[in-house]
Amino acid sequence: MDVERLQEALKDFEKRGKKEVCPILDQFLCHVAKTGETMVQWSQFKGYFIFKLEKVMDDFRTSAPEPRGPPNPNVEYIPFEEMKERILKIVTGFNGIPFTIQRLCELLTDPRRNYTGTDKFLRGVEKNVMVVSCVYPSSEKNNSSSLNRMNGVMFPGNSPGYSERSNVNGPGTPRPVNRPKVSLSTPMTTNGLPDSTEHKESSLQQTEDKKHSDSPASDSEGAQSSPVKNKHSEDDPAEAEGHEVKRLKFDKEGEARDAPNQSASSEVSLGMGEESETSSTSQDKEKDSICARQHCTEEDEEESFMSPRNAGPDRKDQEKDTESSTVNEESSEENQMEESDQSQAEKDLHSDNSESSGSVSSGADCSETEELGSYGSETPETSSETPMENSEEATEVADEPMEQD
């Protein structure tokens, strides 16, 4: 449909003093009823639309009089003139094209298509008129790309013509909200704002700081774990020495006799002081006493298994020997306890003195170790003679009852 011809026809209708139906304008209303496209502004065809609406309502009443029966009790009865004035008042108050313009044009061009009674027709028109949302001509929508409409409400861009068409239908209607567009190509933060370069740089710095903080932490953990391992390595030899000492106490007689000679030779080779040699002699004495105790226990067991026949004077001699051996054992135990205490104190002193005497010349150390070695070799011989004599006496006592049998 030609827009220029339409605008000329509308101007001619406004100039006429007597309002009459125009075929061109009726064709325009039919076009809107079919397509919903309004090619001109509301101010231009508002007069003809009101004229056509009033004429259709009057014609509908004359052709279809009011029903003779009683009105519907569930619906409020409103006289025709009152309803007509209400509808015309609402339409004249429009500042823009109502979004129901297509349905209204259908009612104007073909009023009897869906309605037969006048009251129902007026209620249908009133229902489509009582709206506030508005639309704009399709020509403006095609020409201005910045105009956006959602549910009949236009969200403007930067169009200069929007200020003239800012009002919508009805009193107290809120103005459309001007919402800025945000491009989705840029990354969004948690609060909906675009992520800036400063934020990216700060995040990169934070990640780098975390990496640097993690690396020293791992180094410190390694440093902490290494001294713990060193402590365990230092404690292991001490525990091993303790186990070796316990093992030596429970060895057999031959191993107990060979151990003093090996310990003396190792001490001479290492250049230990007098305190270490005295402690080794005390250990030798302890081992000899342990061997003597083992012999005594074996003799007691043999005596317990002897027959009652030999319970005569030989038993008395054996009891005397055992009493003397027990007295010797008690005295030797006391001496061993005292010597062990002295040896521990001497070991502590030697550990302190050995740290301070690390700078002594090697020649003096060798001379002292040779003298102490000779002294140490004499002392085990003397100590070893005493348990040997005790063991010989014990074997003689054990052999006498065997001869009597």
Swiss-Prot record:
Protein's name in the database: Serine/threonine-protein phosphatase 4 regulatory subunit 2
Organism field: Gallus gallus (Chicken)
GO terms for cellular component: cytoplasm; nucleus; protein phosphatase 4 complex
Compositional bias per record (Low complexity), positions renumbered to this chain: 354-366, 377-389
Family in the record: Belongs to the PPP4R2 family.
Biased composition (Basic and acidic residues): 196-214, 231-258, 312-323, 344-353
Sequence ranges of Acidic residues compositional bias: 330-341, 390-405
GO molecular function: protein phosphatase regulator activity
Region (Disordered): 140-405
Pfam families associated with the record: PPP4R2
Domain of life, source organism: Eukaryota
Disulfide bond sites: none
Biased composition (Polar residues): 140-149, 160-170, 183-194, 215-228
Membrane spanning stretches: none
Complex and partners: Serine/threonine-protein phosphatase 4 (PP4) occurs in different assemblies of the catalytic and one or more regulatory subunits.
Function: Regulatory subunit of serine/threonine-protein phosphatase 4 (PP4).
